[in-house]
Every structure is written in structure tokens, then in C-alpha cells.
């Protein structure tokens, strides 16, 4: 995904306010051997890009003054109540150095999972993204969580996922975190329990 930016020479609160008033968003690109560089981007283009899932978890081609650099979106600041992007941070990436990125999880076959279709359970997403370590070339846009065989009262863990080649999960101490589960809604009972129940004779 290509992102066009321009070098920014003037800094400070007043300069940033003037930029925003002219339809631009201030930002920075840092990392690697090069010095941090102040940049500005078209606000509307950035606003629409931020709505795309891939913009948050893909290697971007960031073009500044005609020169393209590989980068990741690292942070962005929104106005507390206006639809306005106040600032954005990008980090340079090297093809030979591993990166740590949160990758979105895509839950597949939720409606046809036995625990949902037959057991009348609901799927709860315990995690919606997974932090991974990999080389930039191996970074996936998303990771699939296949629920095709998931039963009622089953919990899907990290060990149940098939991670792409070259991709390692970062779990921060929990070696096999829960990803999703299928349970009955509150107050409901399983079909087996309903069929097995017997009426109590009147006294």
C-alpha cells in the first residue's frame, strides 16, 4: 500500500494547527539508521486509509519527496470528538530485521461451526488480533481462525492456529492463550439437556 507524504520543516503547536487548518496532518517517520523525519500528509487520504484494516498491519510504501521507504504505521492520535487525525507515526523497517506487529484475526466458518449450528451456542472472540514476530516479507495481512469443527463449550487456543511460515506469536508469558470460545447464551440450556429433561408430576 502506497502512502504519499511531504517533508515538514516547521514544528511546534502553532505550525501544526496551521497545517491541520489547510487539510494536512503532521507526522513523523523514525527508526533505522536514518534520522527521524518530520512529514505531513493529506488529511482526507489518511482518514480513509485508517479505515482499512490492511493499513494498520501491512508494510507500507511511504513516499517522501519522491523517495520511497518501507514503513509500518505505529501510532495515530485522534481529536477527542471531531473526525480529525491530529498526528501520525511511522516506523522504518529493514528487510533483514524482524518486526513486532499486531495482526488481525479473521474468524472463519462461525455460522457453520457445530457448536453454533447444532448446539445453538454463540462465538466469543477473546482476542481480535495477535502480536507476531517475523521478517517484513513474511508479515501476513491477517491470520485465520477456522471454527469449522468447533463444538459447544470448546475454547480455541493459540496452539489450534496454523501460523504462516516464518511467523512466531508473541504471547507475553501466556504460552497458549485462548483465542475464542463457543458457549450457550446466558439462561439457555443445551439441546441435550432440553431433550433429557422430564416433567415433574404434580403433587
Swiss-Prot record:
Keyword Protein biosynthesis listed? The answer is: no
Q: Which domain of life is it from?
A: Bacteria
What Gene3D superfamilies does the entry give? Ribosomal protein L25, beta domain, Ribosomal Protein L25, Chain P
Q: What InterPro entries does the database record attribute to this sequence?
A: Rbsml_bL25/Gln-tRNA_synth_N, Ribosomal_bL25/Gln-tRNA_synth, Ribosomal_bL25_b-dom, Ribosomal_bL25_C, Ribosomal_bL25_long, Ribosomal_bL25_short, Ribosomal_L25_dom, Ribosomal_uL5_bac-type
Q: What keywords were assigned to this record?
A: Ribonucleoprotein, Ribosomal protein, RNA-binding, rRNA-binding
- Which Pfam families does the record match to this protein? Ribosomal_L25p (PF01386), Ribosomal_TL5_C (PF14693)
What GO annotations for molecular function exist for this entry?
A: 5S rRNA binding; structural constituent of ribosome
Cellular component terms per the entry's GO annotation: cytosolic large ribosomal subunit
Which GO BP annotation is one of this protein's? translation
Q: What family classification does the UniProt entry report for this protein? A: Belongs to the bacterial ribosomal protein bL25 family. CTC subfamily.
Q: How does it assemble?
A: Part of the 50S ribosomal subunit; part of the 5S rRNA/L5/L18/L25 subcomplex. Contacts the 5S rRNA. Binds to the 5S rRNA independently of L5 and L18.
Q: What does this protein do?
A: This is one of the proteins that binds to the 5S RNA in the ribosome where it forms part of the central protuberance.
Please report the name of this protein according to its UniProt entry. Answer: Large ribosomal subunit protein bL25
**Which species is listed as the source?**
Cupriavidus metallidurans (strain ATCC 43123 / DSM 2839 / NBRC 102507 / CH34) (Ralstonia metallidurans)
